[in-house]
């Protein structure tokens, strides 16, 4: 997927508002913990783009994001 759009992500979450919150949580987690080895090609992209791509491609679910946020 060359470009991530909101429409790609809305299939995975209920509303645009949920998408904003979840993507920001995931982007903050990426910035805090750094890019993993599996994200090596994505280091050129901003964390928000990586987070949106993960959501769109179902690499991470809203439940996983929320669980990670609660666990710290």
Curated annotation (Swiss-Prot):
GO terms for molecular function: DNA binding; DNA-directed RNA polymerase activity. InterPro entries: DNA-dir_RNA_pol_omega, Pol_omega/Rpo6/RPB6, RPB6/omega-like_sf. GO terms for cellular component: DNA-directed RNA polymerase complex. The keyword Nucleotidyltransferase applies. The keyword Ribonucleoprotein does not apply. It is an enzyme of class 2 (transferase). One of its GO terms (biological process) is DNA-templated transcription. Keywords: DNA-directed RNA polymerase, Nucleotidyltransferase, Transcription, Transferase. Signal peptide: none annotated. It catalyses: RNA(n) + a ribonucleoside 5'-triphosphate = RNA(n+1) + diphosphate. Its EC number is 2.7.7.6. The RNAP catalytic core consists of 2 alpha, 1 beta, 1 beta' and 1 omega subunit. When a sigma factor is associated with the core the holoenzyme is formed, which can initiate transcription. Belongs to the RNA polymerase subunit omega family. Promotes RNA polymerase assembly. Latches the N- and C-terminal regions of the beta' subunit thereby facilitating its interaction with the beta and alpha subunits. This is DNA-directed RNA polymerase subunit omega. The lineage of its organism: Bacteria, Pseudomonadati, Pseudomonadota, Gammaproteobacteria, Thiotrichales. The gene is rpoZ.
């Amino acid at each position: 997927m060359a470009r991530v759009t909101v429409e790609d992500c809305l299939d995975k979450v209920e509303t645009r508002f949920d998408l904003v919150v979840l993507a920001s949580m995931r982007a903050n987690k990426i910035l805090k913990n750094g890019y993993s080895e599996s994200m090596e090609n994505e280091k050129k992209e901003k964390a928000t783009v990586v987070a949106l791509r993960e959501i769109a491609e179902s690499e991470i679910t809203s439940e996983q994001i929320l669980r990670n946020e609660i666990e710290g």
